[in-house]
């Protein structure tokens, strides 16, 4: 499940496995005591919460922590500030490349996922029939460049998210520093969920409004009946101005609570499934096989993401009501109304596009990292969701 804040995407797994960066190495140096699965080494967030913090995204708990100060971000001790800054910026470029490459399918996912809210608000003429229909209509009505609408906010979100990862890291590591072999599986598992929820929510608190703005821009369709085909928002700043004017700060954080719950749900499913299935399937020659481990991680990531996808749908549907006359009273009210009026399948609209997005981004990021190795002599990961 967050652009989804944040859950590991396939592209982040690929870069984490095949192309481990200096950024990820520094982060792992500060990582929590519990060892993560091989396919989950990369600091990231699954697409639904991304960035994230949810496609955050959200950030893996063992990778979010703090320096001594909750305000200032300190570079790892063994690296000079200059090298750290270069890694940080290059990680941003890498994140921008992967996010921009996947932006068209990401917008299609959001359009399909939130189309019922757009129909109710009179901002969509008729429902989309599928991924191909959504692509075709969007290009026909708005032009091919519109497929990247909302991508700027998604790229910008990387930088505060990455800084917050360092800002919150050590604090939550000290609070939930349980070891699986010493404290037992269930205590480690509970600590992992708690640290993930606390760290994810803390980071998400600062970047959630960017995810909100990205969602509103991506779903600002030009083919609407309302407004004679004109867009509702003229850009990122306009989203903030109009939302604050109509709904205040609360409008920027609609769906925040259910987003935090989504972190716990996803992490519980991911780690629970991985720890349960890996000892059974990855035995013998498969135990040390990268491809077998990657395939298992890919299946579990998408399985956990699909199971937690309804949470992402509810939070984004709640986002879409900011500025509208009728709003959901709560996340439970949103869930109940969606199921009652549209059926349970409506909670999974856009899930297929969400999987395709991860596949599309994987090859692009791997290729980009290979280019970095040739040009710079080292690889930089995206570092964040």
Swiss-Prot record:
- Residues annotated as transit peptide in the record: 1-74
Q: Name one GO biological process term.
A: mitochondrial ATP transmembrane transport
What Pfam families is this protein classified in? Mito_carr (PF00153)
Q: Which residues bind ADP?
A: 157, 169, 315
Q: What is its main location?
A: mitochondrion
The superkingdom of the source organism is Eukaryota
Assembly description: Monomer.
Q: What name has this protein been given in UniProt?
A: ADP,ATP carrier protein 2, mitochondrial
């Amino acid at each position: 499940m967050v652009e989804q804040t944040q859950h590991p995407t396939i592209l982040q797994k690929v870069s984490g496995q095949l192309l481990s960066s200096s950024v990820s190495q520094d982060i792992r140096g500060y990582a929590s005591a519990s060892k993560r699965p091989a396919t989950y080494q990369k600091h990231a967030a699954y697409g639904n919460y991304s960035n994230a913090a949810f496609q955050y995204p959200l950030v893996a708990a063992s990778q979010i922590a703090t320096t001594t100060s909750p305000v200032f971000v300190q570079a790892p001790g063994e690296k000079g500030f200059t090298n750290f800054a270069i890694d940080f910026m290059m990680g941003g470029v890498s994140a921008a490349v992967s996010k921009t490459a996947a932006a068209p399918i990401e917008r299609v996912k959001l359009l399909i996922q939130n189309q019922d809210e757009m129909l109710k608000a009179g901002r969509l003429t008729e429902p989309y029939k599928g991924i191909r229909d959504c692509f075709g209509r969007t290009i026909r009505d708005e032009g091919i460049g519109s497929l990247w609408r909302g991508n700027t906010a998604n790229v910008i979100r990387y930088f505060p998210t990455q800084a917050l990862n360092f800002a919150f890291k050590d604090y939550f590591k000290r609070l939930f520093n349980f070891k699986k072999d010493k404290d037992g599986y269930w205590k480690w598992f509970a600590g992992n969920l708690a640290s993930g929820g606390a760290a994810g929510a803390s980071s998400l608190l600062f970047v959630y409004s960017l995810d909100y703005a990205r969602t509103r821009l991506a779903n600002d369709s030009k083919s609407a009946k309302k407004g004679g085909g004109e867009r509702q928002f003229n850009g990122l700043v306009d989203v903030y101005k109009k939302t604050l004017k109509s709904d205040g700060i609360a409008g920027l954080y609609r769906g925040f609570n259910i987003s935090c719950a989504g972190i716990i749900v996803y992490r519980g499913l991911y780690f629970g499934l991985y720890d349960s299935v890996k000892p059974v399937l990855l035995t013998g020659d498969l135990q040390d096989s990268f491809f077998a481990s990657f395939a298992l991680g890919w299946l579990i990531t998408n399985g956990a993401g699909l199971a937690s996808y309804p949470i992402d749908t509810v939070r984004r549907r709640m986002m879409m009501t900011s500025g509208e006359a009728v709003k959901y009273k709560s996340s439970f009210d949103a869930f109940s109304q969606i199921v009652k009026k549209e059926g349970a399948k409506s909670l999974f609209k856009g899930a297929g596009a969400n999987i395709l997005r991860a596949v599309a981004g994987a090859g692009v990021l791997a290729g980009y990292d290979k280019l970095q190795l040739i040009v710079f002599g080292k690889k930089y990961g995206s570092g964040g969701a």
